[in-house]
Amino acid sequence: NYLISKKLVKQFYTPYSCSEETLKRAHSENYIKHIKNKTLDQNTIKKIGFPLVDSVVRRSLVATGGTVLASKLAINYGIACNTAGGSHHANFEGGAGYCVFNDVAVATHYLLDRGLAGRILIVDLDVHQGNGSADIFKNNKNVFTFSMHSKTNYPVKKSISDLDVE
């Protein structure tokens, strides 16, 4: 691999499918069940923007597992990333904006629940506001959500992050 041969990275890791137990801290059991069974209502499927098929469900579970894995690796090695992550529009009750599960929220809860971190800063520099992350952590004093985004972009109705820069 080019990145390894140039010593830009030491190793690549293969993500795993995120467990239902881990997902439940950031998403409702009902929503998770409907995603896994592919029985989600058409309105929520439309909000997500993807058809609810096996490949989308699998990709969403593995991408979320990848962010949890990257968060653990970052704790151990000081830095790690998951290039398939960043699904910041999904909230507790459902997905939106091409985001099925909020992988950053899932990984944040994972680290906090296991005492691997005491406080977490979520820095979201996407052109779209991280509304799902803001909603999930709006009452959590151990998580600070910072979103720098376009004021006139999706989502039309913005959530309130701890700090929004438009």
Predicted regions, residues:
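HDAC/HDAC-like amidohydrolase catalytic core signature
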Residues: N1-E166
